[in-house]
Amino acid sequence: MPRVKRGVQARARHKKVLKQAKGYYGARSRVYRVAFQAVTKAGQYAYRDRRNKKRVFRQLWIARINAAARQNEMSYSRFINGLKKASIEIDRKILADIAVFDKVAFAALVEKAKAAL
């Protein structure tokens, strides 16, 4: 069996990991063994949090809509129910944006939701 030398592949793999670990503190950006662990863990966190981000933003939108709806004497759940009955299909992201930046338009939506209930 012929001898196999793998120095080139190992060097390339190490360089790739160390490049990904650029900006990390101390040994995490300089030592392959430590950098590999740091990069792997960072990848796990990134994967998990890309999914978690969707939940977090939905919670934020609901909190903003609820706060704006309560300023107009209506709860979040009754507001959403009223919009559904009024056949107004605006997603929570846009509703939250309207609630923050256009109070008059949001108040009009609340009135339409109240009328539909």
From Swiss-Prot:
Indicate the secretion signal residues. Answer: none
Q: Which GO terms describe its cellular component?
A: ribonucleoprotein complex; ribosome
Q: Which cysteines are joined by disulfide bonds?
A: none
Is this entry keyworded RNA-binding? yes
State a single Gene Ontology molecular function.
Answer: rRNA binding
From the UniProt record, give one GO term of the biological process aspect: translation
* Gene3D superfamilies per the UniProt record, alphabetical: 6.10.160.10, Ribosomal protein L20
Matches recorded under InterPro entries: Ribosomal_bL20, RIBOSOMAL_L20_CS, Ribosomal_protein_bL20_C
CDD domains attached to this UniProt entry: Ribosomal_L20
Recorded family membership: Belongs to the bacterial ribosomal protein bL20 family.
Q: What biological function has been recorded for the protein in this entry?
A: Binds directly to 23S ribosomal RNA and is necessary for the in vitro assembly process of the 50S ribosomal subunit. It is not involved in the protein synthesizing functions of that subunit.
Q: Which HAMAP family match?
A: Ribosomal_bL20
> Could you tell me which PANTHER family the record lists for this protein?
39S RIBOSOMAL PROTEIN L20 (PTHR10986)
Protein name per its UniProtKB record:
Large ribosomal subunit protein bL20
Which source organism does the UniProt entry give?
Answer: Aliivibrio fischeri (strain ATCC 700601 / ES114)
Question: Which gene is the coding source of this polypeptide chain?
Answer: rplT
